[in-house]
């Protein structure tokens, strides 16, 4: 399952604190990217962004995010991809049934 994890730094959080925490955890994994981390995006302006994390275990997702929770808050949602053309076809059918 793919999870959209929006993060926003707490007002007291500094760039240096975030950098230190990320590097600490990176070194603890012997310099390896977490296998479950599929994407990492920051929002323009800083202090917020989102992660795409893949895991079938919600407890593992919580464990992945918890080391950062003193620095930032998370809003987490399960997501899935859509095929655009297939969605258009299905929406046409729905619209035709409504007529």
Describe the function of each predicted region.
Residues 1-99:
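Conserved, structured core segments of small domains
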């Amino acid at each position: 399952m793919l999870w959209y994890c929006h993060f926003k730094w707490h007002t007291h959080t500094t760039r240096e604190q975030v950098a230190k925490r990320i590097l600490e955890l990176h070194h603890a994994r012997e310099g390896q990217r977490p296998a479950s981390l599929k994407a990492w995006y920051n929002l323009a302006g800083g202090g917020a962004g989102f992660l795409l994390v893949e895991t079938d275990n919600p407890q593992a997702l919580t464990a992945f995010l918890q080391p950062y929770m003193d620095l930032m808050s998370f809003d987490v949602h399960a997501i899935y991809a859509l095929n655009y053309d297939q969605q258009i076809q299905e929406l046409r059918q729905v619209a035709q049934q409504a007529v």
